[in-house]
Amino acid sequence: MKRIAIAILCMLPFAAAAQNQHLISPDDSIPSLVERIIAEREGGYKIRKIKSNINLEFYTTANAYFTDGKLDDLSFKMNRVRLEIAGRLNDHLSYHFRQSFNKYTNPHSMDNLSSSIEYANITWHASDRFNLVAGKQFVALGGYEAYVNAMRLMEFCDFNNNVAVYQAGLMGVIQFNPSQQLLVQVVNNRSGSDSDLYIYGRPDGLEAAKVPLLATLNWNGLFLDDALHFRYSASVGQLAKGKNIYYLTCGNIYEKYPFIAYLDVMYSREGIDSQQRITALQGHGKGMLPVTAQNTSYLSFIGNFDYHFHPKWNAYVKGAYETSGIYEANGIFAKGRYITSWNAQACLEWFPFTEEKGLKVFAHYLYKGYELTENAEVMMASMPHTQRISLGLVYVIPVL
């Protein structure tokens, strides 16, 4: 026993040295990222012509909240603060990192990343026709609202607001031609454990998924001199043994200055209620033991019209109509519709400096209405109509 202990003690310094080994040594002569961007020359420095940028993104508002027309609260809010680093190291490798400072920083059990890390990936550009993306990335759902940068949106629909769209995995990008693209993606369907995903845990009697992945096929097409854009996708994944999730999502976009118009259709069929919108209705009745709903379906229609009527001014109106239901009875949940919801938005945006596209000041109005069916009322659920008036500022600062 003494000999074993002495042998282990003798090995400890070598183990420590191994842990302290540098993956890249100064003697390797590998240029750093800064050196790839900035080159030294006589009389000073010059910026190399490689694609790289660092952005700081701020989105803040003063909000007045109303319930059924009565003022609830007037306060300031930092909606989003993000740091984004993206660029291309050479002809074959690019990178994308983005961190939000408005989300939890504790690592999740599955991907070992916090939800504050939205992007952390490397792209291998194998050829002009094929790229491979590895790491945390955006789930390749169809639709314009799901795809566009969140800094350009004042409010998501309930569907997109309840889908975890940043997951770790792999994606192949096939570029048939400049206007036709196919994405083939496999990612985790969640970041953490079942207890993190479902507020009342995985339903009793269901075994955990052995392959908790989501596979997506996404087609993007451009037509009419790139003014007409289609984003269609289909996804399938496993939530538990015998319980799957399916997404069918599509976006139909017309974008030609000074107009942007789109119509998105989003549908999910979930063996277990991953969006939790029906599950969250319960818990208000006496003697009810809350459980996670099964066999849920969600459908959303989102329409938007932007009019950039002046170089410094843009206005848009937007609406969404959404339904939530159970497609097969289970436990306390009867088959049928539970929620019909809609929202209406109007926004006026001012760009103080035409050369500074990343800065805008805006006024925004949001109305959200809900109608509960008898299925939901049985659970003593209530969802009042709400309104919000916001004055805000969005500033994307190009640091590099």
Can you describe what each PLM-predicted range is?
Residues 1-22:
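Bacterial Sec-dependent N-terminal signal peptides
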Residues 45-64, 70-192, 221-224, 370:
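Outer membrane beta-barrel
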Residues 185, 189-247:
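Loop-centered beta-sheet repeat module
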Residues 112-115, 191-198, 334, 338-341:
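Short, electropositive alpha-helical surface patch
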Residues 18-59, 392-395:
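N-terminal periplasmic/intermembrane-space "pro-region" immediately following the signal or transit peptide
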